[in-house]
Each structure stands twice: as C-alpha cells, then as structure tokens.
C-alpha cells in the first residue's frame, strides 16, 4: 500500500495499476474464494513437522498444524549498519522504503535537500517522489558501474527530472551530529575502494539508502531450511519445495524479484 506509484499489473492484468490497486485485486480474489486469513498476526516459529506458532491481540499465542506450509515472508532492506559508512548517527538517515512509508502512508516530510545512495528501484522511485513533494534531490550515487534499477525507472525518475546519477561512487562520510548537514561522496575503483582525491561534498539534510534487499529468512533458518549462498533464499526443487518436506517457498523470500508481476 505504500507503493502509490503506477507501473504494477502490466504483465499479470495487462493494465497499469498503482500499488494499492494491484493489492486490492488479490484481496478481492481471496475474499471471493472465502479463504480465511488473520491480519496483524506474527508467526514466531515453524517446526519441521509444520506446526506454525503465531500471536495476535485477539487470539493470543496459538498454533496451527499444517499439511503444507508456503513461505512468503518477502524481503527487507539492507540497513546502514551493514554498510560501514564512517560518521555520526544523526537524524535524517532513512532506508528508501522507510522514507516511502513515512511520506505515502503517514503524510510526513522526511527532508528538503536529499542525497540518495544506491540506484535500486525503490531509491529511483523515491527520487521522483521527493522531487514531486518539493524536495531537492542533489544526486543519486551508485557503488557499481551500472544502475541496480530498471531502465524505465532511470528515465522516468531521474532523467525526466534532471537528477544526476553518479556511477562508481559511494558515501565515504556523513556530516552532522544532531541532524545530517551533508555527505561526502568519492569515486571507487574496480576493487570498490575509494580513489583518493575524488571526494565531493554535498550539503543536505537527508540521506536515503537504497542499497539492496535481503530475503527475510529467519523463520526458514529456524526450522532448518537449507539456504542458497547465491540468492540468500531457500534452496528448492522444481516444485519449489525446500529441504524440509512439505515446506515450500515463493516470491521475494526465494530470491529478490525485479517485478512484482
């Protein structure tokens, strides 16, 4: 629901939908089939014999014995702590998805002068979104020599708004104690190490991080599912069954997909 931009459904429904419209199609399908579901419910454990333990306000702690379990936990954003960026920890540093939720669902402005690290699709879309909300996006920096987002998003979100994209660049310092006051970018070589003398300072009050997604597999690991080092998701057979009998995986928990369709 926080993805209020369009571009969804082109492959599945053969029409262009916003995120909430796309989600509503599947909600309607579930209701039409009268499939029971529980909202605001957190699964805290799945055993190898497929007993699912969950908790919510209405039922408290409860368990369900399943004949089959489908893992569909999705993925999460890589946090700042995984990036080893020097500097203080001031206010004004957000993952792109957090900023997206704050702006689109909570109605909060996260900043006025913005630098974005990473050119994943969420980061590119947020560059456009923040520009439309009146913020100034100074630059989008990408560590790799190529963008991590779709070509159409580079054109529609950066080129159309004159937002510069610096490839083979990364943030090497964050300035500011209470609030971000600026960041220093530098060019990196093929070994991804900073090239001395290429530092550039950008004054800003906000840094958005769009540095990749990680399949959410804590539950998978807890039940002993084998994880692929290539995808960070479960290893599956041709039927998408994991190494645990009767447990299947799909979607972004299996591997990060470029398109929701």
State where each predicted segment sits.
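Anionic-ligand-binding alpha/beta catalytic cores of soluble enzymes and soluble regulatory domains
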Residues: 257-261
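A Rossmann-like FAD-binding core segment of flavoenzymes
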Residues: 27-56, 64, 131-218
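Iron-sulfur-cluster electron-transfer modules
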Residues: 1-60, 64, 68-85, 89-92, ...
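Beta1-alpha1 glycine-rich phosphate/pyrophosphate-binding loop at the start
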Residues: 1-25, 29, 101-104, 110-156, ...
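Glycine-rich dinucleotide-binding loop and its adjacent helix/turn
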Residues: 75-115, 119-124, 230-238
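A short, basic/flexible loop-to-alpha-helix module at the beginning of a structural domain
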Residues: 58-61, 98-111, 192-199
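FAD-site-proximal beta/loop scaffold in flavoenzymes
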Residues: 71, 93-103, 206-254
């Amino acid at each position: 629901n926080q993805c209020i931009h369009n571009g969804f459904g082109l492959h599945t429904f053969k029409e262009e939908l916003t995120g909430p419209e796309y989600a509503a199609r599947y909600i309607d399908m579930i209701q039409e089939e009268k499939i029971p579901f529980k909202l605001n419910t957190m699964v805290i454990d799945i055993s190898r014999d497929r007993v699912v333990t969950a908790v919510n306000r209405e039922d408290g702690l409860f368990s369900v014995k399943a004949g089959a379990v489908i893992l569909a936990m999705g993925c999460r954003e890589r946090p700042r702590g995984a990036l080893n960026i020097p500097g203080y920890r001031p206010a004004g540093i957000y993952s792109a998805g957090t900023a997206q939720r704050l702006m689109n669902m909570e109605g909060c402005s996260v900043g006025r002068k913005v630098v974005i690290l990473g050119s994943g699709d969420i980061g590119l879309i947020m560059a456009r979104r923040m520009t439309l909300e009146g913020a100034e996006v100074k630059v989008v920096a990408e560590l790799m020599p190529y963008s991590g987002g779709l070509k159409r998003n580079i054109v529609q979100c950066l080129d159309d708004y004159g937002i510069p994209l610096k490839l083979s660049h990364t943030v090497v310092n964050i300035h500011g104690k209470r609030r971000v006051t600026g960041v220093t970018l530098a060019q990196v070589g093929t070994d991804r190490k900073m090239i001395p003398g290429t530092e550039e300072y950008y004054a800003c009050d906000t840094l958005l991080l769009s540095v990749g997604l990680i399949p959410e597999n804590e539950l998978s690991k807890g039940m002993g599912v084998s994880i692929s080092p290539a995808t960070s998701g479960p290893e599956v057979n041709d039927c998408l069954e994991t190494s645990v009998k009767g447990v299947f995986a799909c979607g972004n928990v299996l591997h990060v997909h470029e398109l929701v369709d």
